[in-house]
C-alpha cells in the first residue's frame, strides 16, 4: 500500500521534471547555404578584429600590439582611405557604429575608444568589465563578446550591464564567441578558430543557424592564426561581407536556406 502511495505521489513530480527537461531542449541549428557574389582585395597584413559597412565604405578595426589601427576602406579596390594608429600598448578589437560615432574595443585593458565617424578624431573613452572581443549595436544596446559563451548587452552611455545571454545550441553552451554583427534581430557571430558563422537569436541566445565557410579563399600557406573574423552586412542588398585575420580577400555572399 505504501509503495503504491509513493508511486502515486512521485509520478506527477516525475512528469513535471520530464516536461521541464523537454521544454529546455534546443533544436539543432539549421545549415545555411551561400552564393559567392564577389571577392574584393584586402590588406593581407591587416589582422581584422572588427568590420562594418556604412554608406558604401568599410570601417575596420585591426589588432596586434604596435600594429592596431582604425581604418576606412574602399571595398572594391581595398584602398585605405583613412587610417588612425592606436597606441603601442593597445590591441584593437571589435568595432561598432552608433549614430556618428565609432566605438572600438581593446582586448585586455577594459577600455574602449570613441571616434568621430568623419574625422577619426578621438572624442571619448568608455570602460567595461573583462576582455573585449566583438562589439555590435542593436539600436538600443551595445552587444559585447569576450571569448566565452556569454554575450553582454550594455547601456550605451555608461556601458553598464543591462542583461546577458548565454549562447547555446543542441549540445550546450557555445564559447569562443568573437566578431559580431547585428542583423534584423539576429546576431551573426564568428567563433575563434572555427570556419563558421553562427546566427543567434538576440533574446534567447539560442543558435538558430550555422553558415559553414570552410571553402572560402584564405591565405596560402595557411597561417594558424589567419582565422575567419570579420562580418559586415549591407542592408541595401542583404549581402554579407566576410573576411579574416590577414586574409587577402573580402568575400561578398548571398546567404540562403
Regions found by a protein language model. Give the residues of each.
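Signature of short aromatic-glycine-proline-rich micro-motifs recurring in repeat-based ectodomains
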Residues: 48, 177, 224-232
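A short helix->beta-strand "capping" segment at the edge of beta-propeller domains
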Residues: 26-44, 78
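Conserved beta-strand position repeated across blades of beta-propeller domains
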Residues: 52, 94-96, 136, 181, ...
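Surface loop/turn motifs at the tips and blade-to-blade linkers of beta-strand repeat domains
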Residues: 39-44, 84-88, 124-129, 166-172, ...
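Beta-strand-rich domains and repeat architectures in extracellular enzymes and scaffolds
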Residues: 37-69, 85-96
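Short coil/turn segments that connect the beta-strands within blades of beta-propeller domains
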Residues: 55-56, 99-100, 139-140, 184-185, ...
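Conserved beta-strand positions in repeat-built beta-propeller and related beta-rich domains
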Residues: 58-64, 102-109, 144-148, 189-193, ...
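Short loop/turn segments that connect beta-strands within beta-propeller blades
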Residues: 74-77, 116-120, 156-159, 202-205, ...
